[in-house]
């Protein structure tokens, strides 16, 4: 599945990461007598959780310089899509690499310049804003969720509470 836009990214991430969280939720409610509304809320919450966690992984992977680096793999993650969308010569190195105009070997010699581009571009902040929107939606769904204490609170603690403190 080729990701060319933020909308494509969000759909793909919900399908990929959201499905993992939906499966985990299913394992939790499968033996319970849940209403269709509760199951739908859990699935919506799972989709939000998938996005929250994937955006965090994408941000971290863009900044690492080992084999897991998303930039070197030309992955079209949320921060990468942001960088690809900026029409400014300052971001040409990044865009040329994704377009195949320059090699990975050349990119590796330009590590400091690329890190500067990443840090000054706003792509990290943009990703954090999108993640914050997902967190707000997750909180809204969570607040409406009918679940027994302390399990409801434990679920939040395990799945996304640590992200609520991110600036």
What does each model-found stretch correspond to?
Residues 1-167:
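All-alpha prenyltransferase/terpene-synthase fold signal
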């Amino acid at each position: 599945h080729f990701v060319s836009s933020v909308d494509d990214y969000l759909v793909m991430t919900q399908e990929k990461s959201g499905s993992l969280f939906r499966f985990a939720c299913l394992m939790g409610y499968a033996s319970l007598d849940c209403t269709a509304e509760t199951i739908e809320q859990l699935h919506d919450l799972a989709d939000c959780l998938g996005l929250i966690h994937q955006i965090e992984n994408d941000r971290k992977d863009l900044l690492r310089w080992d084999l897991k680096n998303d930039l070197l793999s030309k992955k079209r993650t949320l921060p990468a899509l942001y960088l690809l969308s900026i029409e400014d010569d300052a971001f040409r190195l990044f865009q040329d690499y994704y377009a195949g105009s320059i090699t990975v070997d050349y990119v590796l010699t330009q590590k400091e310049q690329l890190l500067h581009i990443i840090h000054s571009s706003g792509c990290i902040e943009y990703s954090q804003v999108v993640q914050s929107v997902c967190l707000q939606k997750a909180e809204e769904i969570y607040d409406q969720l009918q679940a027994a204490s302390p399990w409801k609170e434990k679920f939040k603690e395990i799945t996304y509470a640590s992200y609520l403190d991110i600036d």
